[in-house]
């Protein structure tokens, strides 16, 4: 009997030794306990992270806050994390290509976990999970339930229907199913109608900013409701941060106007107020974004727009379609009237795109590798008598730094050639209409001709590879844009950024 008891204790000890630990309500998983955690929890959200990853560090407090909130509610949903640098087998098994990668497991299904795609704040995480595990809209039987829902999140949508089986109520539920990151509630209770000053069916979007609530007006259809929510779910002016980036770039509004404003400036409140006043006329059309130009994390964005800290406050507009296009106001005045006028003129198609260019250095053609800027690009690259091979680079790009000595040797090789020119252009400070650069370094060949031909180089990045390409007239090593490997620099180590944040970096 004693032997049996000791055996049971020993087995229990082994099981406990493999049981997941908890850090701030978040389960710590390893390969040895991953399957056990999936079996123990019906719903499990797992973050694959790296200890050195800046985005993971920024997410950590919000992730823990979400985990604690769900645990306190007695939810079946648990949050977990895996150090993918230590558990490389798990990372490979679940296709982790960047950090953080967050996957949602339901009923222990390892074949097709759902990728988490919502925002990086605790409310976003909780709302997304509840929508994935519960009804599209929570039934609100009384005023207390309604108040709890409304107070639970920055944004909540409530449908007030005296008949919850009506066609309008069904359209409302379809809209609720289409949105993952906002909680929806539905009620037929007369006391709830009275509590929120409704005397007939309606839909209200409640929010903890700006005007506090928006009442839907019009025919209740799924499409109309989604449009109404799109117009009203974000603040009139939203600050660009690590947490808000997914909301900004994941939304349907692809025209963004950005106010670069240091929080330390003396008239900060006044300039932000002017920007907000202008925003009122463009809800659902243009997203108004404020960027703290003093913040270190935002310096790359300033660089992308060709701005320096000392040039701020400043306003720029960008369209995030397939090809991004930037626009600059004609006036540097930051009054509400000027900003409003600029936006109207943009929407009317009266503003020309803004292309950045550095000043042309006096010695731009004195070295074997010629220096191109926006102002001399056309004359050099499309010279009908010259074959011009150009590297489009970024100063911070590690791949570009590795290529630099090879590119210099290539310049030396052809410095006395009668019709071959080796050149480079800093694409973070110069833009040209003829070439869209999506990754760094990008290498393009402009053969001597009158038809403005552009050939992409997709061969080996070696001196011999480049020489073969040039001696073959741009054939040996040529490739289409679709074949180009995306070699945009990631912060070392290579896997720091997840897909959402990499998209932000690609765009900004």
Swiss-Prot record:
The record marks 461 as: Lowers pKa of C-terminal Cys of second active site. Keywords: Acetylation, Cell membrane, Chaperone, Disulfide bond, Endoplasmic reticulum, Isomerase, Membrane, Phosphoprotein, Redox-active center, Repeat, Signal. It is found in: Endoplasmic reticulum; Endoplasmic reticulum lumen; Melanosome; Cell membrane. The gene is P4HB. This is Protein disulfide-isomerase. One of its GO terms (biological process) is protein folding. It is a peripheral membrane protein. It catalyses: Catalyzes the rearrangement of -S-S- bonds in proteins. The record marks 120 as: Lowers pKa of C-terminal Cys of first active site. Disulfide bonds join 53-56, 397-400. InterPro entries: PDI_thioredoxin-like_dom, Prot_disulphide_isomerase, Thioredoxin-like_sf, Thioredoxin_CS, Thioredoxin_domain. Heterodimer; heterodimerizes with the protein microsomal triglyceride transfer MTTP. Homodimer. Monomers and homotetramers may also occur. Interacts with P4HA2, forming a heterotetramer consisting of 2 alpha subunits (P4HA2) and 2 beta (P4HB), where P4HB plays the role of a structural subunit; this tetramer catalyzes the formation of 4-hydroxyproline in collagen. Also constitutes the structural subunit of the microsomal triacylglycerol transfer protein MTTP in mammalian cells. Stabilizes both enzymes and retain them in the ER without contributing to the catalytic activity. Binds UBQLN1. Belongs to the protein disulfide isomerase family. Residues 471-508 are annotated as: Disordered. SUPFAM superfamilies: Thioredoxin-like. The active site is at residues 53, 56, 397, 400. This multifunctional protein catalyzes the formation, breakage and rearrangement of disulfide bonds. At the cell surface, seems to act as a reductase that cleaves disulfide bonds of proteins attached to the cell. May therefore cause structural modifications of exofacial proteins. Inside the cell, seems to form/rearrange disulfide bonds of nascent proteins. At high concentrations and following phosphorylation by FAM20C, functions as a chaperone that inhibits aggregation of misfolded proteins. At low concentrations, facilitates aggregation (anti-chaperone activity).
